[in-house]
């Protein structure tokens, strides 16, 4: 007798990508319940950072402190399970992706299209981040200031 079961279809997403999409769906459900409060977003970011590997956690903590001090108008929230900082419209401006999220050898500081980083016809929107230093902090401050300008 012929096999009538349908073989599993590959959707092209890795397990990590599917997990991130599930995290985002949960975030959207939580935001829809009585509206997300700034305190809820902050706690979600802190919880996200706490779950990271020690090296990533140290970077994420520095990014968090630097972004919130540089642009206090940005609201902390999680975005696909990652620490992110959104404008008053709730649109993510800047986010931190830890190296463990998708198995990369570096963490990423990324900016969405709401960030004002335009510089000619081409400009970077993501930065590999391996270690924190005074020079890195200065560059992050400059990028965040430009992003919210």
Predicted segments with their positions:
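Charge-dense, helix-prone N-terminal extensions
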Residues: 1-149
């Amino acid at each position: 007798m012929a096999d009538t079961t349908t073989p599993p279809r590959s959707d092209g997403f890795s397990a990590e990508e599917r997990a991130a999409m599930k995290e985002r769906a949960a975030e959207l459900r939580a935001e829809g319940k009585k509206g997300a409060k700034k305190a809820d977003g902050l706690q979600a970011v802190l919880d996200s950072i706490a779950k990271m590997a020690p090296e990533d956690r140290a970077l994420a903590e520095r990014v968090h402190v630097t972004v919130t001090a540089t642009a206090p108008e940005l609201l902390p929230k999680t975005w696909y399970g990652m620490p992110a900082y959104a404008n008053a419209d709730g649109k993510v401006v800047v986010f931190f992706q830890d190296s463990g999220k998708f198995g990369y050898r570096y963490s990423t500081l990324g900016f969405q299209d709401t960030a004002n980083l335009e510089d000619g016809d081409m400009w970077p929107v993501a930065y590999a981040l391996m270690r924190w230093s005074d020079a890195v902090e200065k560059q992050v401050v400059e990028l965040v200031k430009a992003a919210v300008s």
